Amino acid sequence: MDSGSVAAERPRRTPSRQRLPSSGCGVPARPGVSTLPGGRSWLRPRGRAARASPLLFLLLVPSPRLAATATATAPRRTLAERSRPGLVLPAAALGAGRNALGRLRLGARRVAALASSRRELSLSAKCHQLEHRKENLPLSVSRQLYFDTHALVCLLEANGFTIQQAEIIVSALVKITETNMNIIYKDMVSKMQQEIALQQVLSKIANVKKDMVILEKSEFSALRAENEKIKLELHQLKQQVMDEVTKVRTDTKLNFNLEKSRVKELYSLNEKKMLELRTEIVSLHAQQDRALTQTDRKIETEVAGLKTMLEAHKLDTIKYLAGSVFTCLTVALGFYRLWI
């Protein structure tokens, strides 16, 4: 129940209704509750303080001792004096009104905390309701009164309120309690309904257990047999795979050993061939060295023979040249003597 719904349900004020003076209570306004001016506007709920108003009654109504002392000390005013506009309230009435307002504001603070805790409780209770709601409650439950309205009206009149103001306040409190109790009945369940829901849940659990036993006897046995068959097949396949793997391993080992022996034989043959080739190469190198030494010796002998022949031819040519030169000189001298 929010402030909008309360404002919509509030009856309209007649023009003849008088307001209390603004200085009647002498208390500054607070954000949760407005002051006395405006008649019943000080009971206008704001925010979360409108929901948990059942505690508001206990905080609003003063104790019997305070009420007795207030009524004993304050003189009783007549109806004509109450209906006069602009009449100042007596000091006892003002004190009682201030006490009621102080209790109301203190209750507003407590109500905010209680509203938040009640909201958390309702949210946690919704998970365990199991779809049992309170729509089928009798109307007498939601329409019954939870406090003495006549005594509260009399108490408000004794504290300085008019009859109309007291009736409006009591009607607003009755509506607030009805809406809060309806919200509580919608959010919560009774102990009997909780026991019924618990019995239903237990019966459903028993049915599920029976179904599980039946499934274990019928379907689970078949599933177990199928699982055993599958396990046997898997074991056989595993054995076959292991046999194949061992065969492949032995074949590969044999092939590897054969190839290894063949490679070793080829390596030995290649080594032998390499040794033979090396011996042949060494022999060829020796033959080449021998042939080279023989040719070198032959060349040296030929060169020495040619040198000796050249020396001999040199001497012969020198002899012939010397003889030819002397002959020419002798002929020239002979001709020279002849001419002279």
Curated annotation (Swiss-Prot):
GO terms for biological process: calcium import into the mitochondrion; calcium ion import; calcium ion transmembrane transport; cell migration; cell population proliferation; establishment of localization in cell; generation of precursor metabolites and energy; mitochondrial calcium ion transmembrane transport. One of its GO terms (cellular component) is mitochondrial inner membrane. It is found in: Mitochondrion inner membrane. Residues 197-291 form a coiled coil. It comes from the Eukaryota. The modification N6-acetyllysine is found at residue 204. Keywords: Acetylation, Calcium, Calcium transport, Coiled coil, Ion transport, Membrane, Mitochondrion, Mitochondrion inner membrane, Transmembrane, Transmembrane helix, Transport. One of its GO terms (molecular function) is protein-containing complex binding. The keyword Transcription regulation does not apply. Residues 75-316 are mitochondrial matrix. Disruption phenotype: Conditional knockout mice lacking Mcur1 in cardiomyocytes and endothelial cells are viable and are born at the expected Mendelian. They however show impaired mitochondrial calcium uptake and mitochondrial calcium uniporter (MCU) current. It is a multi-pass membrane protein. Residues 1-54, 340 are mitochondrial intermembrane. Residues 1-44 are annotated as: Disordered. The chain crosses the membrane at residues 55-74, 317-339. Interacts (via coiled coil regions) with MCU; the interaction is direct. Interacts with SMDT1/EMRE; the interaction is direct. Interacts with PPIF. Belongs to the CCDC90 family. Key regulator of mitochondrial calcium uniporter (MCU) required for calcium entry into mitochondrion. Plays a direct role in uniporter-mediated calcium uptake via a direct interaction with MCU. Probably involved in the assembly of the membrane components of the uniporter complex (uniplex). This is Mitochondrial calcium uniporter regulator 1.
